[in-house]
Structures are given as C-alpha cells and as structure tokens.
C-alpha cells in the first residue's frame, strides 16, 4: 500500500467563529468529521480498491478522520481532480455558548473503486439524543454503500440507497443501547450519464430522512432536492395516520417534530420510519451550480432568499460557508451547524 503523505496540522483563530480550525494534508480518499471545523478541499487521492475487499473493516483501516490538503496546494492538485465536482468547502460549528456537544457528522468519498473519478458521495448526519448514531453512520454509511454498489453492479442507485438506509437502521437497532437516540441523514451521490443524442450530463442523486436539507443553486434560481420529513407536512401527517400512527401537538407520539430518522425506535409504533425520499436530477456540464448541504441549525434560520443572495455575491465556496453560518448565528440559531458547499 502506498505510504501516506505527511500530515500537516495547524490551528488558527477564525474571526467569525473564535473556533479552532484543524487542517490536515493527506492523499487518502475518505474524509469524515470527527475534528474538523471548516476548510476547503480539492481532491488528490489514491484509488479505493481496498474498501470493497473488506468494507466491514473500513471504519478502522479505511476511514481517515479530518484529512484534507492545504489551501496552498489546490493548484498543484488540480490535474488529479475528481470530475464529479470542482471543489468543496465545509464548516462545522458547535455553538458552544448553547451546546455542550457536537452531534453533527459528515462523510465524503471522493474517488470510487477502479479509478472511477467521475463519482463522489457527500453524506451529512444530524444526531439527536446524543451523537452515537450520527457517529455510527459517519463511520459506516460509505462502506455499506460501496458493498451494495458492487453487488447491484452500479445499475440501480435508488435501490442501493434504499438498501443502505434499511441495512444501517437494522444494524443500529441490534447494537443500540438506547431507543431514544436518532439521526437525520442526507446523502448526495454524484455521477454522470451519457446519451448518444443528448451527450453527457452530471447526475445528482439525493436521499434523505428528516430535516437535514440540500438545495441546488444556479445563477437564475434554486431548487430543493430533499424532502423535509416533519409532522407538520400534510403528506407525512396522512402517512402516519393511515398507518395507525399518532401526532400530538405537532410531534410524532408527542415526542419529536421530524417523522423519519435513523434510530428513535421508541417512536416506531407511532409511525416513524427510516425510508428515504430519493430525488434524481441532471445538470449540464458547462453551467455553474452550487450544492448546499446543511443541518437544521442553518436551514431553520437562513431563508432561501438569504442563501441565494450570498451565493450570487460570492465566488469562493469557503467564504460562502462562513457567511451562511454567520447569518444563521445572526438570525438566532443556537444549534450545532454543519454546512457543505459543493462547487459543480
């Protein structure tokens, strides 16, 4: 196995957040969120064949925490960029004045097996009742996806995503010590499709449970790719009631506002499920788009109009991340916040 690059770590104080920012350099392909606060990344990583050989060991050997390359290496990395995206940035903000713990997590896979460099996965998880389930998903979602990706020969991404949610929720039920912990999830899978008549297009698959949302921004408009699963939604309310569930004071079983999640097994009899909403859309290669994934600590406090204004008036994805989190704080958010900006 190729020897890893040396890891450079530095800590700086960000004027906006007064938070430690930990940045590391590596050639590895997986990025997860155990320590990162915020940084920008252009990928320069080796292939990932070993992940499919033993996905069950991925959380120990294949999953590298909090690793990126440094900003001054972006141009050097450019010849090896993943074709699915141009760059991405992210910020995680605990909001320590109000929150004792960080329950948000994310995982990112930037190169697929067999040097398949036109695909990528971005996954974001917002835990509640503790971080155990969001942490488990952070460490295991991508390895389970790769297992099914190989099994179903890459042909049915919707089926692969459904199997991932079902399998992981079943595993969580087996090992969880509490039925009061849970997590939302939003998964983005980027790929391309080629048609003899229409040519090649970028394809975005989005799967989610809960209220961790994703929107696609262009110069003219924005489109939400996730479906927000809350008891206040009429479709979710009808589904719950049709299945003999119950909503009390706008909460499923009188306990929780979201109606789909991983875990939260005490609410299963009240109508809570872990079946994802899945959306697929195509975009042109020659047009500029930004994907924004964020937890509800941001979406509940930053309007679509405010996000659109920020994206239209700034070109740098890291700066957009900072401005969005600043706006959420300014508008009164007291929650953990995670924001990922993907420049397509």
Where are these regions (language model features)?
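Metal-dependent phosphate/diphosphate-handling catalytic cores characterized by acidic Asp/Glu clusters
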Residues: 42
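Exposed regions on extracellular, virion, or secretory-pathway luminal proteins
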Residues: 14-16, 47
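PP2C/PPM-type serine/threonine phosphatase catalytic core
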Residues: 2-3, 7-14, 21-25, 31, ...
